[in-house]
Amino acid sequence: MPFFDEAASNAWVPSQNEVAQRWQKKVAEFDGYIFVTAEYNRGIPAVLKNALDYAYPEWNKKPTAFVGYGSVGAARAIEQMRLIAIELQMAPTRTGVHIQGADFMSVWKGAKEITELSYLQQNATDMLDQLVWWANALKAARERPTVSAAA
């Protein structure tokens, strides 16, 4: 996907880039999302931010959950993702999965199996339960007719 080079967000004007249009259609197909991210220099990778910026209405009123890996389990990157998700009118889950740097490296190098990281199972289960609950609730809400606050 090219770097964002549109006149404005597709919340305001349609994207001109064909790749962006295909991405927006793909994003619109889903009722919720799980983002897996590393943490680089205390933030999310630029390509992830770029992908998020290329869509707007397609993310709205949908839940999202986060899995991160890095020296502090990508805690700072995931906090940034939560802020971005809220701006995109998404509902982030409270629980995420944070894979600590030493654990990630042990699994990556083959010294451990990911199943040996017992703390991940409960966090993953909680995160997925929250994501499914929000996905069901928000899908039902999106399918109902909109009621004005003035009503």
Feature-to-residue mapping (PLM):
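N-terminal beta1-alpha1-beta2 submodule of the flavodoxin-like/Rossmannoid cofactor-binding fold
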Residues: 1-37, 42-50, 54, 112-125, ...
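A generic "cationic amphipathic patch" detector
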Residues: 46-47, 64, 77, 94, ...
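Short, surface-exposed basic-aromatic patches at helix termini and helix-loop junctions that form
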Residues: 57
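Short, glycine-/small-residue-rich phosphate/pyrophosphate-handling segment
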Residues: 60-108, 116-123
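Rossmann-like dinucleotide/phosphate-binding beta-alpha-beta segment
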Residues: 87-91, 132-137
